[in-house]
Structure formats: structure tokens, C-alpha cells
Amino acid sequence: CIKCGQCVQVCPVEAIKLADLADGYGIGVPHIEARTQACDFSCDGLQCVLACPTGALTHSLNYPAETRMGFARLAQPDSCLAIQGKGFTGQARGPDFTGTLRYEEIDRWNPISVADHPYDLELCDLCMRQCPIEIRIAQCEAGTPPSGDANQCPPRHAIVFESIGSGKAMMPVISDGCVGCGVCEMICPVNPTVIVIDIDKSADTVMAQGN
């Protein structure tokens, strides 16, 4: 990485930032703070990878399911609304949250403000509902893969819900299809967030370790 900022310029949701002195990554290093603005793969074609002039972002990657940005984990499971069997109504992060997502049922190409998209859920499933990998799997199962390209179909789930007991409570379970995009962390309505991204891990390393 030569800190050129090309990836920052092409990101459609402005998820990539150049680190400042206080961020702890090294001045000018591109990074994503998922809780503030996650990567939702709005571009489909991984524009940050295509824009990178040096190969610091691996040019062999062509599709979202191939990326490895980190791995999600439940950091505060006792606070999870789904585990408590609770629903959620309202703006996921409140009226002042500035993060954006691409809601394909509203606009295929243009991300909109999360604050402008309230929810009314009998059981909170926002982490799975908005997961870009799970959205793509659902599209592919319906016979409508993203951009009409079957290669965009993820081979594995990123997050699934498993029943807890006999009630409606559900446990979010991170699967080996997780790419660490951070949408689950960004959209979680609980503060502090229930789910976080470990940027020093990936699906490959976690599954190899059996953790």
C-alpha cells in the first residue's frame, strides 16, 4: 500500500478512510471502521480492488464472497435482542446516524441513509437480514443473482439463526462464509454493539483453528 487513496475515492458508501495519527494504523493507511460505515459491496465489482495500483488489495479477487476483511463474533451475546426473543421497531442506529446501505428493494444502485429506513421486526434479525452475503444467497436461490452473474453467488452462508429452546428466541451463528464486511456490526441496534468484526481474523484462519 502506497497510501494513494484511490480506494477511498471509488468506494460508493465511503466506507474506506485514511488513518490519522490517533487511529493507530499508521498515518494514511486505508481502513474501515465498521460501526461507523461498513462495506456493503454496493459496487458488486470490488471497485477498491480494481482501483488499487500496486496489488496491495489482491487483484485475484473478483467477487464479494472471496474477500477476507475480518471475521464477525458475538461480543455481547447477553444483550442480543434475538437471543432475548425480542423484536425491533424504529431506526436501527437512531435519527442522527450517518451510515448508508444499499437497499435493493428501494434502489439497486444508490445507497441510502440507514436513518431513513426504519424497521418493524417481530424478532430482530438485522445482522442476518442486511448481511450482503445472505442477501446474495437469497437472490441466487430465487434465480436472480446480482447483475445476472451466477459467479456472484456465495458458496457458503455467513450468518444463520438457530433456535434456542421452545420459544422464539434465536441465536446468531457466524458461519464460514463471513467475509468481515462489517454490515452486521454497523446495523446492530444495541449499544454497545452485540456483534463486532475481528480484523485480525478471517474465515480461513478461524475455521482452521476450529474456533
Predicted regions and their residues:
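Iron-sulfur cluster-binding cysteine motifs and their immediate structural context
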Residues: 6-23, 43-65, 88-104, 119-120, ...
